[in-house]
Each structure stands twice: as C-alpha cells, then as structure tokens.
Amino acid sequence: MSESTRTSRAPAEKRLTYQQWKRRKMLRLARNWGLFLAGCAAVVALLTGGILWLLPKVHGLLAGPKVFAASVYDGTDYVFDAADARLTLVNANLPYTAEPAPLLDTADEATGQQLEAEAAMQYRSMAAAAQADGVSLILVAGYQDADTRQAAYEARVQTYRDKRKSEEEAARLAATIQPAANANEHGTGYAADILSADNPQQDTGFAETRAYEWLTAYAAEYGFILRYPQDRQAATGIVFEPWHWRYVGVENALAIRASGLSLEEFIALQRAD
C-alpha cells in the first residue's frame, strides 16, 4: 500500500462503550417522552378550552331564551300629581291648545330621533339595558312638528280614499291609527315609536318579538308605558299599537303598568279619588 493511500484513509470511528450507548439511549427515550407529554398537554388544553367555550352555549340551548319578567310594584307610596307635564293627555278629545315647544335631545344616535330631554336620557339608558339582554331597540319616530304630524295624517286618510271610502269614513278610520296633527302626542316629545331589526314595520307583528316582550317587562322601570294597549280602544280612541310607547316618568309608569289601565283611564281614576 502506498504512502498516499495510507494518509487519505479516514480514521476508524471510535466505538461506544456499553455504558455510553445505554446512556445515549436513555436520553433519547427521555426526549421522546417529553415531546409526547408536551403534545398531550397541548391537546388537553385545546379540548378544555373548547369545552369551556361550548358549555354556556349548550346550557343556553337547553335552558331556552331568557325570560323577561316585570318586577312587582304595589303602588303604596305613589302620589298622583295632576300638574305633572309628563302626564299630559293629547287625543281627539283633548287636542293641543297651542303648539308644544319641548326641550329636545337626541335619543337614538343611529336614527337621529329626538325626544324631550328627560325622556331622551331615559330612552338611552333603556336601550343600553335592552342591548345587554340581547335586544336591539330602534327608535323610528320621536318628536314631530305640526307639519310632519299633519302629513302623516293626510297620508293615512288617502289610503282609505284609495279604498273608495267616503271622505268622512276615511277621516274617521285614519284617526284610529294616525291622529290629526292637533291630536297627535308626538308633538310633546314624550311619544316614542320603537321597533326592532327583526320587525322593522309598524304593525301588530311587533307584539310577537323579543323586543316587545322586553319592553312589556322593563320599559316602566325607565318611565315608558305602552300608550295604546290591546282592548283599550274605547278609552284611547286608537287601535292596538305595540310599537307606540309614551314617557310619563318612572313612578307614574310603574303605577300605570300595575293598574293595567290606559293612560286615559288611569288619569280619570286618579282624578276621581
């Protein structure tokens, strides 16, 4: 063998002793177990997080939708104030003697609708509370000036003219839904037409919504009452309007709701006492 061949051959690899081989094997085994356990921990963490996220949703499905229940109000300490402007009645029998000029504030930023300042503040609080319960309220009509009110009334009359009703009959039917300008309480700034995204139309279908259920239970706690209840047309002159709410102040609203009466009936009863 030549000298060049001997110098280019790689040196022989040093063989491990049994102890060295055994130690290396144990280290490799420990590393593999560590990786396996870390993977298991990651899987457990993912499963636990998923279960914790899913549990409240499953509970919600099993329990059903939240029930909105009104608080009990006995009215023992209620004091009726006939001079309270928030109780002002406006209807066909009690029309405006002068055009109102309420101090207004924006009640719903999304729609730009305004209410009387105190009513607007209470509406904002009410809408926020409803939102916290998963209910979105939409104020579609608040304060309206005389021209707006009259235009709405005339449009309603025209719908009955189009149905070939006489002028007298068209006016009479229109007034049960859309009062004439001088009998429409939207001029006070206390009237609020409230709807929801799932029922954006002013019709009795709103009475089947979660928003109406919420309002029926809690609106009085913010000073609002259902202005034209079902089966009260003889007293109010207006058909059932589940979207039309009226600000009267918290104590008044709680007392009126507890009585089960319309605003007209409640005021008449209080004045008779």
Model-derived segments and spans:
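Extracytoplasmic cell-surface/polysaccharide-interacting catalytic and binding patches
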Residues: 2-273
